[in-house]
Amino acid sequence: MKIVTVEFVKSATLPSGYPPGSLPEVAFVGRSNVGKSSLINTLLRRKQLARTSNTPGRTQLINFFNVNQELLFVDLPGYGFARVPEAVKREWGPMIETYLRDRECLRMVVFILDIRRDPSQEDLALKGWLDYYGRRTLFVLTKSDKLSRGESKRRQRSVQESLALPEMPLIFSAKTGLGRERILEEIRKAKGEARS
């Protein structure tokens, strides 16, 4: 999948603010600070399209990006960061759940985890929730450049076991671009499939 054009469409919190739903969508979800924005920017070959930050919990809206006029990338707020005010956390849960549960044009969820960390209780809960709603999910382990190749493989197997995944999660590095083409290929395949 070749990225030709990318444009920011809008931010929203409620379904009434979402784009029309005429294009297939791929959503990106994960804990705060797992490298979600860096993954999106690397996939799209844009430096600051999705805002990266050293402050976890920066993304507090659902952000929609039009890719090639043929699909939307949807950047969902990161979850699980302690220093985010409790009132904000209470809004995030329903906002993310409503989008993931109800969005008809959602073709795939890219579930992002830091390769150096074990899945949290929140990760396990979200995975169970996505399974329950039958959402096609691609698991991606970021920050692989922080580990040796052997350690990356070991962590890949460990996360697969922890989440009881039928296939190995993909390994990705924003720094080296490792995994970029494979992730884009999975997105391309999902884009063409209607939700079953």
Curated annotation (Swiss-Prot):
Pfam families: MMR_HSR1 (PF01926)
UniProt keyword annotation of Membrane present: no
Residues reported to bind GTP: 30-37, 57-61, 75-78, 142-145, 172-174
Swiss-Prot/TrEMBL cofactor(s): Mg(2+)
GO cellular component, one term: cytosol
Record NCBIfam families: GTPase_YsxC
Job description of the protein: Necessary for normal cell division and for the maintenance of normal septation.
PANTHER family: ENGB-TYPE G DOMAIN-CONTAINING PROTEIN, MSS1/TRME-RELATED GTP-BINDING PROTEIN
Protein name, as recorded: Probable GTP-binding protein EngB
Gene name as annotated: engB
